[in-house]
Amino acid sequence: MATFISVQLKKTSEVDLAKPLVKFIQQTYPSGGEEQAQYCRAAEELSKLRRAAVGRPLDKHEGALETLLRYYDQICSIEPKFPFSENQICLTFTWKDAFDKGSLFGGSVKLALASLGYEKSCVLFNCAALASQIAAEQNLDNDEGLKIAAKHYQFASGAFLHIKETVLSALSREPTVDISPDTVGTLSLIMLAQAQEVFFLKATRDKMKDAIIAKLANQAADYFGDAFKQCQYKDTLPKEVFPVLAAKHCIMQANAEYHQSILAKQQKKFGEEIARLQHAAELIKTVASRYDEYVNVKDFSDKINRALAAAKKDNDFIYHDRVPDLKDLDPIGKATLVKSTPVNVPISQKFTDLFEKMVPVSVQQSLAAYNQRKADLVNRSIAQMREATTLANGVLASLNLPAAIEDVSGDTVPQSILTKSRSVIEQGGIQTVDQLIKELPELLQRNREILDESLRLLDEEEATDNDLRAKFKERWQRTPSNELYKPLRAEGTNFRTVLDKAVQADGQVKECYQSHRDTIVLLCKPEPELNAAIPSANPAKTMQGSEVVNVLKSLLSNLDEVKKEREGLENDLKSVNFDMTSKFLTALAQDGVINEEALSVTELDRVYGGLTTKVQESLKKQEGLLKNIQVSHQEFSKMKQSNNEANLREEVLKNLATAYDNFVELVANLKEGTKFYNELTEILVRFQNKCSDIVFARKTERDELLKDLQQSIAREPSAPSIPTPAYQSSPAGGHAPTPPTPAPRTMPPTKPQPPARPPPPVLPANRAPSATAPSPVGAGTAAPAPSQTPGSAPPPQAQGPPYPTYPGYPGYCQMPMPMGYNPYAYGQYNMPYPPVYHQSPGQAPYPGPQQPSYPFPQPPQQSYYPQQ
């Protein structure tokens, strides 16, 4: 009697998980680090796990189910850790409908989506399906088999119920029928009913009280009845499921009535006993008459009939209790011992996360935002200090300090100028600047080409998508490329803006270079040439040891100390490192969301508060020193002898000092620009890879969608058949009855029966046909046979009956036909009939029209009878 329903597994196409995940890991984590290598190995293991779980047929045992559960747990674990989407990590998963068997012109229905939620739903479906198959394979004659079956049916019910609640939110479009909410909801109820049936079998085996067994059976009957009601009006499950559900409903109801009748007998309610046994017998009779192909209830039927016969006999001879109507009986109670097992990840008890140390995407995004805030704070503080240093150098250069207090002889190069000259020469001089400026346009052009190529890929794919959308209209059901590419195009626009600003910055650097190139060239010359290029002046009166010179030297020394302190502060700002991962993870665990701004600002104030205070103090200290230097320099200028030669010399020295500052700034800016372009190249290459990956994924999705569209178009019914013209329906000059409509092509051809004996050969016109010729049963009024043309030869065999025959039942014996002629070829496939083949004068007639004949000989085909 026990017939259990199990679910077929869905089939999928192979997907390489490792390649896109490894790309993301390499772009996200530092190159060459142990962390990156570990995650790359984990991605390879994940790809192997998918192949083991869904890429091959699975046996019906616990080990195969454990592999499926491990894969499901793993994809649930990585979902928050990787940005799976159509425009980031784009993985297209293709799954076939588990219940669709395909058609003549195409395979089974399948759906391809770039959604990890879709993959999760399909894998969980397979977990439930395999659990149902394992449960159905159990030996229910022992407690262990009953226990395993009940556990797996309840798990399958919970898994199907989980899919019902989550599938629509996980997918961006309608799912296939097998994972639609209606279908999985029905499957969940079927699995729950079978779990209840297992508990009923357990109670029966343990010989529990009949009242309890009756309640368990009645509850199982309700579950089966509800499942049957849900699916009988929807063509979603295989057809063989419906009769099994109906039979199980009746059988469980009969069991409930049977055990309740035993309870009634114990309570001396003999009339109720008979009424319940009669109802049980009727239910089992219905099952035996309608569903005997699916379930065997002979033993149970005999058991009920024996009990009913004994009860009637005892009641008729002893008790004489009135047999009540069924509607007057008290309803049987219900007791459920099953419930759908909720899906709580991890499901597998042996699960180990391959990416255990990887943080969720929300934490990664918060860390990226925190690092950006940190970089902004550090860069802002460093920029303030560098601007202050540049300002100080500019003020000193305009005052010709410290060269003014060093140049007392008027005919030698001041020591500060010599130091700056040696520094310029050591850094490569003007040749370094020339080389760096020459490289900038090449770097810029390379970046532009990468960006243009990336956007070209998007443009081409979008144009193709638009063309196909215009061609197929509403059939083209996927996200439009122009919507999908909006983030990428915004990113590309941002890169374009960055390049435009870089071009402007390059122009400013070149302008500065042209303005100060000659002075920098002079600063690169040897000391004798440099000294010769500087105008000499009359020896100034000795001011060494004067108070104003000593004050200036002290102020300049303090300013140098401030500059050195800034270098230390800059290093301190760059070296501070604090990992916010733990704080973000704690916030995510406690609140479910991360308030990144509040957490980051608080932590940055704590870590960098002291350093930023020192930066502001350094700026204020420099401001005071520069004011004092300017005041002291005014006094120094008044004391210094003034003449034209001295003024000209001082101007040249100022220009040389300014040239040094400009050289340092140019080299720094050019190196920064080169570094910027090289780093931008890496970013643009990643952007190009991202564009290339998504375009490739879209092309793959497009090909799958086109294939599905072709199959769906092929499955669509063709145009209505053209009605047969009137002149083809009967021979000329006759009114023979219309032949029966040929069988539809979906009906298997009926095996032909031996035909009736044919009538005797047609005699000459002066002799009548034999009145004793046999007539086939059911034939209509025969049309007169065509008269024999005088002088023509008689036919080589008996003429066939001049009346139509029904499909599959030819009414005449096969006679020699023209080469290639097959009178059954078109009739088997319901093809339209061409015009009647007219006979030539003097030609022996063909048999009467069974079906319209053919205008030309057809290729040889296999007929029902061998050709003679």
From Swiss-Prot:
Changing I212D: Does not support cytokinesis; loss of normal midbody formation; loss of CHMP4A-, CHMP4B- and CHMP4C-binding in a yeast two-hybrid assay; impairs rescue of PTAP-type L domain-deficient HIV-1 p6; no effect on localization to the midbody. Residues 176-868 are annotated as: Interaction with EIAV p9. Residues 418-868 are annotated as: Interaction with SDCBP. The modification N6-acetyllysine is found at K215. The modification N-acetylalanine is found at A2. The modification Phosphothreonine is found at T479, T738, T741. Keywords: Acetylation, Apoptosis, Cell cycle, Cell division, Cell junction, Cytoplasm, Cytoskeleton, Host-virus interaction, Intellectual disability, Methylation, Phosphoprotein, Primary microcephaly, Protein transport, Secreted, Tight junction, Transport. Changing F676A: Loss of interaction with SDCBP. It comes from the Eukaryota. The modification Phosphoserine is found at S481, S730. It is found in: Cytoplasm, Cytosol; Melanosome; Cytoplasm, Cytoskeleton, Microtubule organizing center, Centrosome; Secreted, Extracellular exosome. Its main location: cytoplasm. InterPro entries: ALIX_V_dom (IPR025304), BRO1_dom (IPR004328), BRO1_sf (IPR038499). Residues 737-763, 792-807, 844-860 have a biased composition (Pro residues). Residues 801-806 are annotated as: Interaction with CEP55. Gene3D superfamilies: alix/aip1 in complex with the ypdl late domain, alix/aip1 like domains. Residues 717-720 are annotated as: Interaction with TSG101. It is linked to Microcephaly 29, primary, autosomal recessive: A form of microcephaly, a disease defined as a head circumference more than 3 standard deviations below the age, sex and ethnically matched mean. Brain weight is markedly reduced and the cerebral cortex is disproportionately small. MCPH29 is characterized by small head circumference apparent at birth and associated with global developmental delay, impaired intellectual development, speech delay, and behavioral abnormalities. Affected individuals also have poor overall growth with short stature, mild dysmorphic facial features, and seizures. Self-associates. Interacts with SH3KBP1/CIN85. Interacts with PDCD6 in a calcium -dependent manner. Interacts with TSG101 in a calcium-dependent manner; PDCD6IP homooligomerization may be required for TSG101-binding. Interacts with SGSM3. Directly interacts with CHMP4A, CHMP4B and CHMP4C. Directly interacts with CEP55 in a 1:2 stoechiometry. The interaction with CEP55 is required for PDCD6IP targeting to the midbody. May interact with PDGFRB. Interacts with SH3GL1 and SH3GL2/endophilin-1. Forms a complex with SDCBP and SDC2. Found in a complex with F-actin, TJP1/ZO-1 and PARD3. (Microbial infection) Interacts with HIV-1 p6. Interacts with HIV-1 p9. This is Programmed cell death 6-interacting protein. It comes from Homo sapiens. The gene is PDCD6IP.
